């Protein structure tokens, strides 16, 4: 019996399968088990795992079996998680029970790299290795993880989730230590760049899994790499500076519509307001994130789904180029910054701006706004030559950076006028109708509400106080001039928003008028931060002349359209005469041939005055009960005054667009909607065939510019009253123009003699507005002006009237508004050619 037992034991041992030398290979050869079908799993029934199973057969539904390895459960699942976090020697000494669990993914040495990083953190080796070596280790690890995780299968992805969470946590610990060590080893405000370093996380789907993209700074520039998403919000880190055009190629690689998942930003604790000049009357810059909230996202400014660019490196060279464009194209028109101070900081490379470091969030917001505004004024050819990128791509990036910078500057809680200056620049930037800007893109209440926000913030900071009150509080001349310029620019865009939405302005006529006399007609080089006494105004053309023209006209525009003091035609005519006298006094010594800015100021001012004279006869009406402005008086039959004044405005706008001296300012010139609609309506009812024949080519050109802009922007032309009125007038005038010999079919010309004859007779007893204006007529130019307007200007038939990058400014024509001389809703401030 013992021998039988021994023999049986020997047979049992011989029947046992031999232990495989490679357990992993044996597990791989094992067939994939069949699990409960989909219906039984959802209904929580026991499945017999037939094909089809009995439950599905009895229910009469299709059976969908599931074939995959079983997921570890209970203590086995905990064992897999523990194995991923234990040291390598512990993993190699795994127990026999662990061998029965699901096999861990082959990390290809990933655990070794994790352990190395963990040891660096624990032993504080970062201070010994230096920032460069630590960054290289981090870059190597990220590249390894990216290579290892890309071909992950559905099963390995589940197991890798545990590893990725642990890895993400340790990388964040490592980066925090690197950041802390950098602050300890490097003096304040003089840190050395980290090379390379993670810049920003981005969410993006990849291979059915939830992965993230991140922008990594490498010696070759910014690169987008894949990495598993961290479980918590990631703090953006500052990155080294770039120069040249390296940033553009990498910024546009990612999808602009990937939804962001991590928006929290960690601000460096040492970004505080340094000493020096508090140029904005600020009481100190607090942490905008801790004291406020993400105001812009709530207000709809950051309404795109693109990720944040706030942590991307500062491109000094690109910023310098765009600042030069701003100083040339924008600063002469929107005069809210001190030109020499801005040039020293962004062009010459000064470390501070008016005593504030370039790391200050308010200064960053101003830089982003300057670049965004400047990029808008460039043509497509200029963008390609300077940055090798399209204008739309540059504008998309610059707009996003501007919005994020304003958000992080704490717009709603700021006490710094620099942030408000940046916000105003953001609001006045016009861009393509169908693409990216705020003012021209959003024709609803969005910009209208944001303008109201800007006005409230300015009032909350006391920037609207009268100059006498500021003097009593010890306000310097420098502070006063910048404050008044900002306030009057806000008054300007407030008037524009009122026209756009057919509402009353928020700023009263008195609040706007009291500040105008205190703005000096001087150059920015005449004063600086240390100027102790006021500087007297000049008689000649200065940096502020054109801005003063717009300030004075917008004050008159409030009286014309919203004030109760101009209810009669005589009062309105008197006000128009006063405005003309004030404006042309500023241009008394302006030589249009001296510079492009002088040429533009001269002709643009005349265009503004023509719009004022037209608005004298056609006041703006909100269409609300109790409006201040009465309907226009009935006109005599055959009166062509409206048509004359509308044509003067249209012709002057065409002249500015056609002459090469207006290239840098074309972003500012828009289609005068009031003049265009009035001219079309008057031609439809005018009986003077000769006048209509001379006027119609100008009307066709102006209307075609608007139409071509809509086509170039790939947006449908709104079929509103203006379109119907234009088609109706064309049909009516077609036989009349042919009989009158207008030659419209042969060329789109306007004879200069005819153009000169488009001046209505001067009323008897009229007082000349300015000695430079021949015979006292506002429409007649001097010999000097005439030479500037036609000396180098080819005839109309040789001009290409295609509107290049100049957007049409004006709210869309709304249903129910008839564009006639009796009832017209201008929707824009045609006093200023609508450039707010």
UniProtKB/Swiss-Prot annotation:
Keywords: DNA-binding, Metal-binding, Nucleus, Transcription, Transcription regulation, Zinc. It comes from the Eukaryota. It is found in: Nucleus. Its main location: nucleus. GO terms for molecular function: DNA binding; DNA-binding transcription factor activity, RNA polymerase II-specific; zinc ion binding. Residues 1-29, 72-114 are annotated as: Disordered. Pfam families: Fungal_trans (PF04082), Zn_clus (PF00172). The keyword S-adenosyl-L-methionine does not apply. Viridicatumtoxin and its derivative, viridicatumtoxin B, exhibit anti-methicillin-resistant Staphylococcus aureus (anti-MRSA) activity. Moreover, viridicatumtoxin and a C2 acetyl analog, spirohexaline, have been demonstrated to inhibit bacterial undecaprenyl diphosphate synthase, a potential new target for antibiotic development. One of its GO terms (biological process) is DNA-templated transcription. GO terms for cellular component: nucleus. Residues 37-63 bind DNA. Residues 1-26, 79-88 have a biased composition (Polar residues). PANTHER family: UNCHARACTERIZED TRANSCRIPTIONAL REGULATORY PROTEIN, ZN(II)2CYS6 TRANSCRIPTION FACTOR (EUROFUNG). Probable transcription factor that regulates expression of the gene cluster that mediates the biosynthesis of viridicatumtoxin, a tetracycline-like fungal meroterpenoid with a unique, fused spirobicyclic ring system. This is Transcription factor vrtR2. It comes from Penicillium aethiopicum.
């Amino acid at each position: 019996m013992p021998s039988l037992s021994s023999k049986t034991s020997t047979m049992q041992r011989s029947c046992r399968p031999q232990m495989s030398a490679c357990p992993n290979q044996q597990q791989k050869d094992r067939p994939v088990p069949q699990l409960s079908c989909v219906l039984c799993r959802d209904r929580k029934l026991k499945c017999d795992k037939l094909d089809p199973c009995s439950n599905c057969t009895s229910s009469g539904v299709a059976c969908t079996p599931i074939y995959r390895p079983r997921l570890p459960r209970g203590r086995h699942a905990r064992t897999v998680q523990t194995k991923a976090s234990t040291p390598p020697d512990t993993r190699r000494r795994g127990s026999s029970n662990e061998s029965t669990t699901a096999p861990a993914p082959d990390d290809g040495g990933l655990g070794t790299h994790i352990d190395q990083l963990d040891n660096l953190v624990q032993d504080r080796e970062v201070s010994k290795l230096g920032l460069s070596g630590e960054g290289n280790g981090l870059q190597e690890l990220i590249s390894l993880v990216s290579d290892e995780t890309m071909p992950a299968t559905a099963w390995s992805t589940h197991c890798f989730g545990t590893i990725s969470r642990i890895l993400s946590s340790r990388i964040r610990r490592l980066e925090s230590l690197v950041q802390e060590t950098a602050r300890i080893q490097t003096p304040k405000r003089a840190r050395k760049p980290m090379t390379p370093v993670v810049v920003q996380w981005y969410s993006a789907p990849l291979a059915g899994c939830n992965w993230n993209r991140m922008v990594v700074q490498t010696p070759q520039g910014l690169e987008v790499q894949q990495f598993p998403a961290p479980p918590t919000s990631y703090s953006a880190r500052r990155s080294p500076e770039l120069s040249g055009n390296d940033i553009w190629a990498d910024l546009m690689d990612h999808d602009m519509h990937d939804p962001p998942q991590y928006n929290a930003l960690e601000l460096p604790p040492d970004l505080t307001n340094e000493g020096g000049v508090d140029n904005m009357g600020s009481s100190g810059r607090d942490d905008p994130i801790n004291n406020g909230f993400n105001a812009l996202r709530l207000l709809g400014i950051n309404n795109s789904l693109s990720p944040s660019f706030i942590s991307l490196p500062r491109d000094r060279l690109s910023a310098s180029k765009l600042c030069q464009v701003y100083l040339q194209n924008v600063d002469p028109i929107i005069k809210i910054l001190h030109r020499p101070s801005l040039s020293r900081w962004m062009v010459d490379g000064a470390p501070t701006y008016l005593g504030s470091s370039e790391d200050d969030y308010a200064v960053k917001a101003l830089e982003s706004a300057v670049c965004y505004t400047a990029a808008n004024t460039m043509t497509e050819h200029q963008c390609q030559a300077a940055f090798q990128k399209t204008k739309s791509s540059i504008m998309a990036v610059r707009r996003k950076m501007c919005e994020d910078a304003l958000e992080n500057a704490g717009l709603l809680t700021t006490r710094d006028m620099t942030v408000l200056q940046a916000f105003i620049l953001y609001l006045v930037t016009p861009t393509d109708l169908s693409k990216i800007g705020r003012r021209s893109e959003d024709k609803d209440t969005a910009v209208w509400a944001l303008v109201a926000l800007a006005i409230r913030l300015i009032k909350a900071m006391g920037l609207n106080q009268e100059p006498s009150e500021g003097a009593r509080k010890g306000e310097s001349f420098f502070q006063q001039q910048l404050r008044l310029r900002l306030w009057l620019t806000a008054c300007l865009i407030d008037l524009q928003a009122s026209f756009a939405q057919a509402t009353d302005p928020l700023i009263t006529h008195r609040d706007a008028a009291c500040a105008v006399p205190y703005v000096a007609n001087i150059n920015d080089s005449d004063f600086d931060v240390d100027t102790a006494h006021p500087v007297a105004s000049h008689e000649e053309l200065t940096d502020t002349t054109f801005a003063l023209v717009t300030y004075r006209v917008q004050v008159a525009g409030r009286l014309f359209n919203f004030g109760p003091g101009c209810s009669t035609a005589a009062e309105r005519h008197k006000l128009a005469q006063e405005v003309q006298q004030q404006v042309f006094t500023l241009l008394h010594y302006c030589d249009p041939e001296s510079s492009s800015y002088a040429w533009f100021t001269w002709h643009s001012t005349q265009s503004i005055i023509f719009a004022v004279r037209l608005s004298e006869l056609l006041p703006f009406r909100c269409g609300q009960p109790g409006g201040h402005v009465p309907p226009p008086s009935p006109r005599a039959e055959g009166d062509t005054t409206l048509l004359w004044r509308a044509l003067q405005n249209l012709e002057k706008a065409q002249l500015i667009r056609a002459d090469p001296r207006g290239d840098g300012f074309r972003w500012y010139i828009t289609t005068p909607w009031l003049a265009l609609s009035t001219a079309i309506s008057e031609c439809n009812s005018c009986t003077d065939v000769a006048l209509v024949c001379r006027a119609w080519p100008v009307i066709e050109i102006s209307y075609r510019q608007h139409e071509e802009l809509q086509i170039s922007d790939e947006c449908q032309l709104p079929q509103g009253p203006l379109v119907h009125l234009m088609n109706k007038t064309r049909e009516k005038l077609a036989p009349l123009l042919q009989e009158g010999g207008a030659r419209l079919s042969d060329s789109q010309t306007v004879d200069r003699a005819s153009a000169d004859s488009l001046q209505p007779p001067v009323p008897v007893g009229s007082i000349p507005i300015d000695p430079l204006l021949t015979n006292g007529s506002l429409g007649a130019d001097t010999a000097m002006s005439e030479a500037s307007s036609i000396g180098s200007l080819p005839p109309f038939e040789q001009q290409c009237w295609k509107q290049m990058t100049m957007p049409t400014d004006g709210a869309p024509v709304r249903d129910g508004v008839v564009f006639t001389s009796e009832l017209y809703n201008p929707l824009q401030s045609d006093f200023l050619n609508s450039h707010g």
